[in-house]
Amino acid sequence: VRRLIKAVSNLDYPKDCLQIQILDDSIDETKEICEEEYQKLLDSGFDVELIHRKDRVGYKAGALENGMESAKGDYIYILDADFVPDSDVLHKMIHFFTDDRVGMVQTRWGHINKSYSILTRVQALFLDGHHAVEQTARSRSGRFFNFNGTAGILRKSAIIDSGGWQHDTICEDLDLSYRAQMKRWKFIYLVDVVTPAELPPNMDGFK
């Protein structure tokens, strides 16, 4: 979490156009880490909000829905805790939204620790197949493809128009993706824009 928040603070984007939300449903020491990093961002002049939920209703979908209530911007950039975005990534993505029908822009996942173990190498192989082959082919051929839950930007009005984040599914990203595309929102996949992430290094992390 600390690494992600540091990377977000280094994004090359005007502070007055950026709101940072830390959505924390943790039940361990992560809560204290989030509070420390929140204060650092606040002291550095960021528009930042820390939302810690105790009930965890709806899990990730519930956290995203809750965050939407106070999100100020028109575009929502979602990052899971194990991702580390490059500083220029927003400049490579945001201009696609000049098309009013673009509802989502997805980047390809990279792998910080691909060579760590057999498990990480296998995960990387399958994920690369999904991203570099399946997602790319679906996007370029005009077929439906899904937002991968992280490392992408969604237009807030597209989320609202498509019915928002739903709690009655374990794949809230896939669910929203298809509802949005059925509403004729365009999705764009950027195979050449990579957002690095850490793969679970062992079976405990993989679970």
Place the predicted regions along the sequence by residue.
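Catalytic donor-sugar/metal-binding loop of nucleotide-sugar-dependent glycosyltransferases
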Residues: 168, 177-195
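Acidic donor-binding segment of Leloir-type glycosyltransferases
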Residues: 9-51, 56
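Long helical/loop segments within the catalytic core of UDP-sugar-dependent glycosyltransferases
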Residues: 38-75, 87-170, 181, 203, ...
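Active-site donor/metal-binding and catalytic loop motifs
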Residues: 3, 191-206
